[in-house]
């Protein structure tokens, strides 16, 4: 499998450790804010394993800081339009938010749109996937970070192992090959 949790009989899983990526992103954002601040979390679709694992990692990472408060955690379904509308609604209630961590880049980019429209340009926004739009937003300074999940690299490695297995029946040493990407 590529990117999703592997079943017991899976030959190989390549991709990012979603829990670890959520944890790493949360720590990076919390450290940037000096270990204190109010956070909004934009969750992924209910039941999506990558969204659940990222969210668990985010919550664990942020819980390590006494000065961090998660003021809201709500789904944006990995959609830019929902990221924007959810953020618009939440910033009316939480006008002093310091950061938004979205469980994917599309939701994060929607949050950026909402925050820009509200002239809240100092709010840190983080996402996941390393999309072109999010990478450009980081370069432009409208997003703090995106976590590159490298789907091309994951697919390439999975195919290389499959070809090797078909050619000489060599199995990988483990069932999961994580990609060391960075926030």
What are these regions (language model features)?
Residues 42, 46-50, 61, 157-183:
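Hinge/cleft segment of the Venus flytrap/periplasmic-binding protein
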Residues 104-112, 150-167:
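Extracellular/periplasmic ligand-binding modules, especially the Venus flytrap/periplasmic-binding
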Residues 1, 12-13, 38-43, 71-73, ...:
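Structural recognition of the beta-strand scaffold that forms the well-ordered cores
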Residues 3-6, 19, 45-49, 76-80, ...:
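Solvent-exposed loop/turn segments at secondary-structure junctions
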Residues 21-25, 49-68, 82, 86, ...:
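Short, solvent-exposed amphipathic alpha-helices that sit
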Residues 58, 71-72, 76-137:
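Hydrophobic alpha-helical
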Residues 1-20, 31, 38, 131-139, ...:
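Flexible loop/hinge segments that line or gate small-molecule binding clefts
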Residues 2-5, 28-32, 36, 61-65, ...:
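Structured segments of extracytoplasmic/periplasmic soluble domains
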């Amino acid at each position: 499998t590529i990117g999703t949790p592997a079943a017991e009989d899976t030959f190989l899983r390549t991709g990012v450790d979603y829990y670890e990526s959520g944890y790493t992103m949360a720590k990076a954002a919390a450290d940037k804010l000096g270990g204190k601040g109010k956070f909004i979390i934009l969750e992924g679709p209910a039941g999506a394993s990558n969204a659940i694992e990222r969210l668990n990692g985010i919550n664990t990472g942020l819980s390590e800081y006494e000065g961090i408060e998660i003021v809201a955690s709500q789904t944006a379904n990995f959609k830019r339009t929902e990221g924007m509308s959810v953020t618009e609604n939440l910033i009316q209630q939480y006008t002093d938010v310091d950061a938004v961590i979205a469980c994917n880049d599309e939701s994060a980019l929607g949050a950026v749109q909402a925050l820009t429209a509200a002239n809240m340009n100092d709010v840190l926004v983080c996402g996941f996937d390393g999309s072109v739009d999010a990478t450009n937003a980081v370069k432009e300074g409208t997003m703090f970070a995106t976590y590159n999940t490298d789907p091309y690299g994951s697919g390439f490695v999975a195919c290389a192992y499959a070809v090797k297995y078909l050619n000489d029946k060599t199995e990988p040493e483990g069932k999961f090959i994580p990609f060391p990407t960075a926030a």
